[in-house]
């Protein structure tokens, strides 16, 4: 006699590293088994609290239509990549074009790396440092500039002397001078970035504290990368991949990147950022962090194409009617009143007998909110997607004390979502 499959033993899903804590992916085998058991080809599957389009991805792979109401704008961005992964050749071409795009008197990559110029401790050749190791300030002075060492790559020393390509050297006076020097347009850069953050009640200094998590030269580099991502015209899947790569460059290019050890946790409470703990931190070149993000996203797409569910290319529509009666195969949205109205209008357009309506509502309960998740979501959404997307989040909770969601919060959220989606769900 065959035993029943256990949810606990189901193989966990995979996602990008940033979303492992914010919105973990569901087990793919469990999702597929539920879709196969409770729906048939041509039916529409609804995910009320999506975590990156994984339910919709599995539904499309099984010849179903899909409606995914994502839990946040960031998971909506991830779902764009999951449901319509770009061609890797197009992504590589877009990244190379960004690196070679003009920036002042040189290219974007060179302009971002110039403030991180240093000398090799062995051959004294000029090169671009990977990162500097600094100490956190103990007071309001310049103690954070008392760096301990720098990491860089010198191909000449590796060829002539051997050893590892990445080398370590002591901080010299020229490095300290460059670290103290602010870019000429530092105030303009901060103003443009400040406009991306919605204001939290009681947090007049919150946005400046968030920007202070990055050094002036890191801010200039990140703003230059973001300006190029948003300024160029390219396909939506490629732009989504570039934004997700930029998302994974934010934490490594901040004071939260501790040394040694793991990333510190961003926590906003009572309208202020809790400062990182004492110790050392890495000031990493933002372009190198962006390159690491591109490699992460590229590997994610390769794994997506070679996974058990295979690669799908969804045709996105605006509402449920476009899936039921049109040529679209999926609808993406963010959970909220507007999404509920779209579902209700789409459900009214179904034919007799419930044809064209949602046959299966499948998904995970919403992730319980806490201070760390909301702080990270607010900070990252404002950086990656801008002010309007970040304003959707319940940011008013950041101005008060620690968030303590009651135990019945998930059940209440599911109940509200199911009531809103009831007109679109077909009867058994």
Label every model-predicted segment.
Residues 2-51, 55-56, 60-359, 366-403, ...:
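Nucleic-acid modification enzymes, centered on SAM-dependent nucleic-acid methyltransferases
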Residues 26-27, 409, 413:
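Soluble or luminal CAZymes and related metallo-dependent hydrolases
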Residues 355, 411-427:
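A short glycine-rich, Lys/Arg-flanked "PGG" loop and its adjoining helix->strand segment in the class I
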